[in-house]
Amino acid sequence: MRINPTTSVPGVSTLEEKNLGRIAQIIGPVLDVAFPPGKMPNIYNALVVKGRDTVGQQINVTCEVQQLLGNNRVRTVAMSATDGLMRGMEVIDTGAPLSVPVGGATLGRIFNVLGEPVDNLGPVDTRTTSPIHRSAPAFIQLDTRLSIFETGIKVVDLLAPYRRGGKIGLFGGAGVGKTVLIMELINNIAKAHGGVSVFGGVGERTREGNDLYMEMKESGVINEQNLAESKVALVYGQXXEPPGARMRVGLTALTMAEYFRDVXEQDVLLFIDNIFRFVQAGSEVSALLGRMPSAVGYQPTLSTEMGSLQERITSTKEGSITSIQAVYVPADDLTDPAPATTFAHLDATTVLSRGLAXKGIYPAVDPLDSTSTMLQPRIVGEEHYETAQRVKQTSQRYKELQDIIAILGLDELSEEDRLTVARARKIERFLSQPFFVAEVFTGSPGKYVGLAETIRGFQLILSGELDGLPEQAFYLVGNIDEATAKAINLDEESKLKK
């Protein structure tokens, strides 16, 4: 149920209907509010400050109760800027946690942390809302079967398969294709699984959020003509927002995803970009609340906060939430408490490599650095496991030989090593793939490759059956049959040129 502070029952004044307090202290985004004795709000309740500033501008700030201080005071964190607030202003206790709209009405729209649309496309149907604070599903509700979540992207499905209802860390710097990979996953999930996606932009650049929205409209992931046909809901709490909003925007996105899982019984993809910013915002709030900092200045409740978010991302008997989280690693230090705490929750890691992106191999997923707990013979089967291991071994050997090739050239290698290098280069190119969402930029149609087709293709390369085909035939194709067809076309083109 939602208690909306903007509406009141006819004939009853707001004062009689609501629990009223007054601002006692303001320290940046942290407000202390005094309430009458016996009228204290609960932890996590949403409070609304309404009034006018000194210039007469309307103020409407929502806060969340974090601590009960005693002496009838509560300490709260604001979800928007506190400019213009003054001591003594009235604060209304809504009597419930923050609630946000959920369901089909959210598709194709952009929301802020409070669940308010920020895309200038009119109001959203708020008849179905859900509180952002919920407990994780009980043990008895969980679906613990190990099953692979097929993405249709060759390199991911073969070498670092995603678990249905699992959590995946997406590691990559700027400009290596994180956004395009995220959009392709959203597109493929919608087509292959009939599922929807929720994107939570946590503390990232506003420009990037805008770019993502524009690219989604261009590629058809968001359908402007008919929003209900869209495959994604977007929730943004960008870098410019106060720490309270950045700390809670992940929960807003998760709440929308939970509705699609529990009520609509779908397989949902939840993207969080960037999970490090969630921790960073929690650290800022923790210091402002006066808690003693822990290691490296992080909040003492780091593991608890991370756990309360991550434990809600899971498979139940109804459906699943599979989460892909971009992870920023501060100063490339993997032992920093923020990434170290995140690693404990991940089932797979997809590492994007600048070296591969520079070669034009997209998706630029590093086949050797990317890992998955699902890549075990008892889960994926002996054939898949063996093929993946041989692909990795061949790629690793090629990597070891690169220094020798750079100094002495290919001719100095043994016959066996030359064969390994030739196959590794074919594998490297065959791991690239044309994306549906990149069609508008590249002009080449996207390809969804099933897991069985992927395994068959790499087995043919490893067995040596395709040693006679040129390398470029394997670049940016779908399955292996397309590579052989491309080789024939290349051969015919070269004959025509002669």
From Swiss-Prot:
ATP binds at G172, G173, A174, G175, V176, G177, K178, T179. Gene3D superfamilies: 2.40.10.170, Bovine Mitochondrial F1-atpase, Atp Synthase Beta Chain, Chain D, domain 3, P-loop containing nucleotide triphosphate hydrolases. It is an enzyme of class 7 (translocase). Pfam families: ATP-synt_ab, ATP-synt_ab_N, ATP-synt_VA_C. Keywords: ATP synthesis, ATP-binding, CF(1), Chloroplast, Hydrogen ion transport, Ion transport, Membrane, Nucleotide-binding, Plastid, Thylakoid, Translocase, Transport. SUPFAM superfamilies: C-terminal domain of alpha and beta subunits of F1 ATP synthase, N-terminal domain of alpha and beta subunits of F1 ATP synthase, P-loop containing nucleoside triphosphate hydrolases. It is a peripheral membrane protein. InterPro entries: AAA+_ATPase (IPR003593), ATP-synt_VA_C (IPR055190), ATP_synth_F1_bsu (IPR005722), ATPase_a/bsu_AS (IPR020003), ATPase_alpha/beta_chains (IPR050053), ATPase_F1/V1/A1_a/bsu_N (IPR004100), ATPase_F1/V1/A1_a/bsu_N_sf (IPR036121), ATPase_F1/V1/A1_a/bsu_nucl-bd (IPR000194). GO terms for molecular function: ATP binding; ATP hydrolysis activity; proton-transporting ATP synthase activity, rotational mechanism. This is ATP synthase subunit beta, chloroplastic. GO terms for cellular component: chloroplast thylakoid membrane; mitochondrion; proton-transporting ATP synthase complex. The keyword ATP-binding applies. Belongs to the ATPase alpha/beta chains family. Produces ATP from ADP in the presence of a proton gradient across the membrane. The catalytic sites are hosted primarily by the beta subunits. One of its GO terms (biological process) is proton motive force-driven mitochondrial ATP synthesis. Its EC number is 7.1.2.2. It is found in: Plastid, Chloroplast thylakoid membrane. It catalyses: ATP + H2O + 4 H(+)(in) = ADP + phosphate + 5 H(+)(out). F-type ATPases have 2 components, CF(1) - the catalytic core - and CF(0) - the membrane proton channel. CF(1) has five subunits: alpha(3), beta(3), gamma(1), delta(1), epsilon(1). CF(0) has four main subunits: a(1), b(1), b'(1) and c(9-12).
